[in-house]
Amino acid sequence: MTERRVPFSLLRSPSWEPFRDWYPAHSRLFDQAFGVPRFPDEWSQWFSSAGWPGYVRPLPAATAEGPAAVTLARPAFSRALNRQLSSGVSEIRQTADRWRVSLDVNHFAPEELTVKTKEGVVEITGKHEERQDEHGYISRCFTRKYTLPPGVDPTLVSSSLSPEGTLTVEAPLPKAVTQSAEITIPVTFEARAQIGGPESEQSGAK
């Protein structure tokens, strides 16, 4: 199968979603800014005090040895938290008729992104050279691959980039073959033609 590069369109305004303004974007999509600076210490302190079950918990030293231990453990905890939230988790959704992937690429310009399909796989690549920001010099690059569902036509894959920096790649799913309802066909019997019947008598009279 040949490789196909998928062009993406730039959305001037975010797509309308009901309840979009009721909750922040990070509740739907984890932070995927590759190489971002670590979180401020006050954030890590708040997370460590919250201790969400099943997500992140305060370090043992922070709970057993008092405030002094919290101060010492804070940088290590902040780095661990940053690794969790910058792991690049994407969001995949599949409905009855559509397959969709959303990826946060807000640190990349449109010309630094490439989306292509090859052998039933969507490959998303982002790369920008070293540049300077408020923290120093940094360069970023990533590659993500997603397997298309069976039967999806790779030529129908499309992508778009929202103003918030969310890249959406989607494709229509093939329609399921519906089985027709069972129909009973009646069998009819044809009667044999009678030899010497009325029709034959009329033809003989002529």
From Swiss-Prot:
Subcellular compartments? Cytoplasm; Nucleus; Cytoplasm, Cytoskeleton, Spindle
Record flagged with keyword Nucleus: yes
Please, one GO biological process term?
Answer: response to heat
**Key words, A-Z:** Acetylation, Chaperone, Cytoplasm, Cytoskeleton, Methylation, Nucleus, Phosphoprotein, Stress response
- Positions carrying N6-acetyllysine: K127
Q: Which domain of life is it from?
A: Eukaryota
Assembly and partners? Homooligomer. Homodimer; becomes monomeric upon activation. Heterooligomer; with HSPB6. Associates with alpha- and beta-tubulin. Interacts with TGFB1I1. Interacts with CRYAB. Interacts with HSPB8. Interacts with HSPBAP1.
Protein name as catalogued: Heat shock protein beta-1
**Which organism is the protein's source?**
Rattus norvegicus (Rat)
